[in-house]
């Protein structure tokens, strides 16, 4: 795994890459120089509606929270909210969520 060509976002191996995902990865080609990068994710179990949201930074700072009565979309947004709460006023956020 390296960086996507012409991008600062880590290269991921996909089984299938719809055009929307390809377009999504080109929203920002360059990070804000000198600012932290937060990698965020959230998900839940469709049946129990229990989930988790969290982030990890390049420096290894991390936070994970257990969620109840949530959806995948709410969990993804919660992870972004957590990163915004714990970061400085300027931050780079990387998410795999097309919804967020």
UniProtKB/Swiss-Prot annotation:
Gene Ontology MF terms: aspartic-type endopeptidase activity; RNA stem-loop binding; RNA-directed DNA polymerase activity; RNA-DNA hybrid ribonuclease activity
InterPro entries hit by this protein: Rev_trsase/Diguanyl_cyclase, RNaseH-like_sf, RNaseH_domain, RNaseH_sf
Family listed: Belongs to the retroviral Pol polyprotein family.
Name this polypeptide is given: Pol polyprotein
Misc remark: This is an African green monkey isolate.
Residues forming coiled coils: none
Keyword Phosphoprotein: no
Keyword annotations: Aspartyl protease, DNA integration, DNA recombination, Endonuclease, Eukaryotic host gene expression shutoff by virus, Eukaryotic host translation shutoff by virus, Host gene expression shutoff by virus, Host-virus interaction, Hydrolase, Multifunctional enzyme, Nuclease, Nucleotidyltransferase, Protease, RNA-directed DNA polymerase, Transferase
Species of origin: Simian immunodeficiency virus agm.vervet (isolate AGM266)
Residue span, RNase H type-1 domain: 32-100
GO process terms (BP): DNA integration; DNA recombination; proteolysis; symbiont-mediated suppression of host gene expression
Name of a matching Pfam family: RNase_H
Free-text function comment from the UniProt entry: During replicative cycle of retroviruses, the reverse-transcribed viral DNA is integrated into the host chromosome by the viral integrase enzyme. RNase H activity is associated with the reverse transcriptase.
Domain of life: Viruses
Gene: pol
């Amino acid at each position: 795994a390296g960086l996507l060509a012409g991008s600062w976002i880590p290269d991921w191996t996909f089984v299938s890459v719809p055009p929307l995902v390809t377009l999504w990865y080109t929203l920002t080609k360059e990070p804000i120089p000198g600012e932290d990068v937060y990698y965020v994710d959230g998900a839940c179990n469709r049946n129990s509606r229990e989930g988790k949201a969290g982030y990890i930074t390049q420096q290894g700072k991390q936070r994970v929270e257990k969620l109840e009565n949530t959806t995948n979309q709410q969990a993804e947004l919660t992870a972004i909210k957590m990163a915004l709460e714990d970061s400085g006023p300027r931050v780079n956020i990387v998410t795999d969520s097309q919804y967020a």
